[in-house]
Amino acid sequence: MSSTIDISLGAPCGAIRAIHGINNSPSIVEAAALPAEKEAFRALRIPRVRHHDAPIENSRYELVDVSRLFPLWRADENDPANYDFRPTDDYFAIARECGADIEFRLGETIEHSTRRYRVMAPEDPAKWARICANVVRHYNEGWADGYHWNIRRWSIWEEPDNIRLLDAPDEDDHGRWGVFESRYLALYEAVSKLLKREFPDILVGGPQTMGASMDKLGCFLSFCKETDSPVDFLAWTCYTGDPEQIVRDVRAVRTLLDGSGFPKADVHLAEWHLGPKCWNTLHVPENREYMSSVHSGAFAAQVLTLLQDEPVDMAYFYGWGIGYWGLWERPFRRPYPVWHAFKAFADMTECTRRLSVECTPAEGVSVLAGEIAEGGKRILVSCYKSAAHVFKLRLPGAAKVSVTALTETGVSNYEIEPSPDGLFHCTGNDGGSAAYLFRT
């Protein structure tokens, strides 16, 4: 049996924040597929993109990772001839053409192999820091036939508590969090201090830990306070089936920053996505179908709605075209269901002001509303693993409402007119997950 949810719009309450960042962007691999991919990416109005695991999305191309920009470790890091920026230049240029700002992740792509090849902790942190400084010079100061792109945000490594992303040859270095304490902290100190000394206007941050562990993040901040290492933003990754978990993490991280003496540092969610049913069976068909289903779309829409009122500065979804983790199914040149949720949220960011909402409380349902410059109203309703509902929208003066519905059966567009009671009635999903965008 369906329950009824009444939705009424109230007074203006600020702006809808475009916090829907993403990991990775349209690929350089196939020129023939690029126009459609760029169009799909541009439609989402992505405010900022960071690039982690980019070589996975650009197979056969050496790009983004520090070991791919500077491939021969024993070479002279001050000689521009020892760098190859070309694939990364082209890759970033596409993202910029699509209107996205860039955060540069200085690090490596994950390695699931038995032996690690690129994620070993740099043997000389000072040299690695100098290499990173030259990367900044290339993109911000024109060094080595480079650019003046003013890339402001630079994150140092990714999940340094994950042995698949930061390893060391000596097992004695493997402490309670892998090599996080024994290797990463010193690396962060070397890189962050050099970058801020040479480029005082950029922002540096880390550590992008697996989850918002207060122990790990607290350890990181304590180390930075003791060593006077700069922290302009604090970041972590989160894969969960509970949207409220992300909200709790954001609040905890903000509180930790303030209590640790970094009140001006921003809060960045470096990676987030609906978590798999089971990490040990990640690649079985059932998991793939779940990760790329309407559940992922409803989850994403709900997270972006809930975070509107939370102290997070950017939330980078993982990712753009990385298989069933992504928004774009590259082999078939078509979007996954979650792309449609991002498109609905992107349409919400066109609103010139946010509107308060009065709504019948319902588990798994969130509502975001706004008004565009011409006066039309927009309402995004996210139903994540919720019961069946009938929505009744109170929209005085509206003659009709256009609906875009993302459900288990796909995406549909239709119009509804007022019922005899003057309200707009919309029968929602029969239970499960869905997302709806209403426009007057």
Where are these regions (language model features)?
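Conserved, mostly hydrophobic/aromatic
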Residues: 22, 95, 135, 154, ...
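Substrate-binding cleft and catalytic face of glycoside hydrolase catalytic domains
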Residues: 44-241
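Mature N-terminal, pre-catalytic/accessory segment of carbohydrate-active enzymes
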Residues: 1-46
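Carbohydrate-binding surface patches
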Residues: 361-399, 403-410, 432-437
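Aromatic/acidic polysaccharide-binding cleft in carbohydrate-active enzymes
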Residues: 273-368, 376
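Noncatalytic carbohydrate-binding groove/subsite architecture in carbohydrate-active enzymes
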Residues: 32-33, 179-300, 310
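C-terminal beta-strand-rich structural cap/linker in extracellular carbohydrate-active enzymes
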Residues: 417-440
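Solvent-exposed beta-strand/loop surfaces of large extracellular or lumenal domains
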Residues: 405-422
